[in-house]
Structure formats: structure tokens, C-alpha cells
């Protein structure tokens, strides 16, 4: 049982974390209705969350490489989801922005160490493991708006369900991964140590090459363009649904889920 949880734990945690990230855009119509926000203010909520997560992740990734910080994982997704829950108590636009920033910090804490957890515990099938990890995040993004849609039925206090999900995730992490120390590597990984050593040696040889900044620039442009388009659509799909199509705010969550899926 524990071995199974250790195998599927990282994608589950990724799903939990991205529940919060995906739900934020679905809450925009709720904020517009309750705080009278305009398009610029609505977009700024998502902008703050995304920028903080993007800037902080490389820094926290460096920290994760230098020091063993497995607690980044439960703390990260807990901060993300509790920040979303706390928006139920927000009394001003500035408070929403602050909580959006905090949710971004939580996401930045989670991702680097979670990726390292996959590598440490499942390096013998790293391709499949990272595939499951990515699917978990995509599922969280897609299901987050559906979960957040409950706010339009039950009111803002429904957001505290995100905190309950975070607590369940923490319990799962404590059961499967805490107290393992350096022994968190699977037996199969130990058997594959020689092959891993060969891969590391090969990586060292390849790392002596020169940086291809032209190719890097092209790749950066493609990734940045995709991310900009993704974020813009995530922000304005629910807004356009309630303003142009005159749809119900609760149904805008379904439109966002269809987009994320």
C-alpha cells in the first residue's frame, strides 16, 4: 500500500497543488460581482500569481538542489490552497492580490522539490514517472475550476474545501514519505545504480559543450508565446462568458475546465 502511494503520490500532490492554480481564474467572475473589478484589475490577480511563481521557482529550485528540503512539498501545496480558501474572507481588492501572490509562492515552493522527489524515488522509470506527474498537474488545473464553481452555489465559504484537500494531502505525504531519510530510493533504483552512474558520466561529458544561445532564444520565444496565450485565455474565458455570451458565472467554470482539459 505504502509503495503504491509513493509511486502515485507525486502526481496526486501535483494535482492538489494545481487545484489552487486552476481555480483562481474560475473565481474571477466571483470577484467581479463582489468587488466591482474591471478587466485590468481582474487580469492583475492572475498576473501577480503567475509572475511570483515564475520568478521564485528558479530561486527555490537552486535551494532544493543545494539543500534537502522535502518539506517544501506539503508546505507548498498547503500555502497555495489555504491562500485560495482565505479569499473567502477577503474584504478588499488589495487583500485578494496579496493572497494571489501568496498562492504563487506556494506553487513555487512545491514544483522544484516535487520534481526532485519523482527523480529520487522513481529514477528507474523516470519517463513514465514524469508523465504521471505532468498528468496530475493537468488534472488539477482542469478540475480546479469545477471545484471553485461551488462558490457560485454555496457562497464564498465553500472555498474552505480547498483547505480540507490540502490537509488530506499533508496526511498522505506524512504517511508515505516522512521519516524515510536517505532511504527514500526504491530497491529498483539501487539495482540500477551502475546505469545511473553511466548516465551521470555521460551528462558530465555533454555539459562541457558551449551554450547555443540562438537555439535557446528560439525555444524561449516559443515557450513564452505559448504561456502568454494560455494565461490570457485562462483570464478572459470566464469574463467573456458572463459579459459577451451572458452566461451564468457558475457555468463559466465549466468553460474553463473544458479549456484546461
Model-derived regions: residue spans:
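Extracytoplasmic gate region of multi-pass secondary transporters
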Residues: 24-25, 215-257
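Residue-level signature of mid-helix packing/kink "hotspots" within the transmembrane helices
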Residues: 22, 50-58, 141-142, 260
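Juxtamembrane intracellular "pre-TM" segments in multi-pass secondary transporters
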Residues: 1, 181-221
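Cytoplasmic helix-loop-helix junction between adjacent transmembrane helices
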Residues: 99-136
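Symmetry-related core transmembrane helices of the 12-TM Major Facilitator Superfamily/SLC fold
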Residues: 159-176
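Conserved MFS/SLC helix-loop-helix module at the cytosolic interface between two early adjacent transmembrane helices
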Residues: 55-91
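Helix-breaking motifs and short loop linkers at transmembrane-helix boundaries and internal kinks
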Residues: 36, 68, 89-94, 123
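Paired small-residue
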Residues: 83, 94-102
Amino acid at each position: 500500500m505504502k509503495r503504491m502511494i509513493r509511486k502515485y503520490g507525486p502526481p496526486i500532490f501535483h494535482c492538489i497543488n494545481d487545484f489552487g492554480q486552476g481555480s483562481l481564474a474560475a473565481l474571477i467572475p466571483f470577484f467581479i460581482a463582489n468587488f466591482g473589478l474591471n478587466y485590468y484589475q481582474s487580469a492583475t490577480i492572475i498576473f501577480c500569481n503567475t509572475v511570483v511563481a515564475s520568478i521564485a521557482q528558479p530561486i527555490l529550485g537552486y535551494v532544493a538542489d543545494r539543500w534537502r528540503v522535502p518539506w517544501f512539498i506539503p508546505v507548498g501545496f498547503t500555502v497555495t490552497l489555504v491562500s485560495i480558501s482565505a479569499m473567502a474572507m477577503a474584504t478588499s481588492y488589495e487583500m485578494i492580490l496579496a493572497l494571489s501572490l501568496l498562492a504563487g509562492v506556494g506553487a513555487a515552493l512545491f514544483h522544484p522539490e516535487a520534481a526532485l522527489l519523482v527523480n529520487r524515488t522513481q529514477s528507474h522509470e523516470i519517463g513514465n514517472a514524469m508523465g504521471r506527474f505532468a498528468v496530475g498537474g493537468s488534472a488539477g488545473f482542469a478540475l480546479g475550476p469545477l471545484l471553485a464553481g461551488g462558490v457560485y452555489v454555496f457562497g464564498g465559504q465553500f472555498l474552505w474545501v480547498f483547505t480540507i484537500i490540502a490537509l488530506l494531502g499533508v496526511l498522505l505525504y506524512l504517511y508515505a514519505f516522512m521519516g524515510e531519510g536517505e532511504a527514500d530510493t526504491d530497491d529498483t533504483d539501487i539495482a540500477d545504480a551502475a546505469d545511473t552512474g553511466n548516465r551521470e558520466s555521460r551528462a558530465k561529458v555533454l555539459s562541457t559543450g558551449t551554450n547555443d544561445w540562438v537555439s535557446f532564444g528560439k525555444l524561449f520565444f516559443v515557450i513564452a508565446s505559448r504561456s502568454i496565450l494560455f494565461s490570457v485565455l485562462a483570464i478572459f474565458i470566464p469574463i467573456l462568458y458572463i459579459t459577451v455570451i451572458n452566461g451564468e458565472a457558475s457555468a463559466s467554470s465549466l468553460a474553463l475546465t473544458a479549456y484546461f482539459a
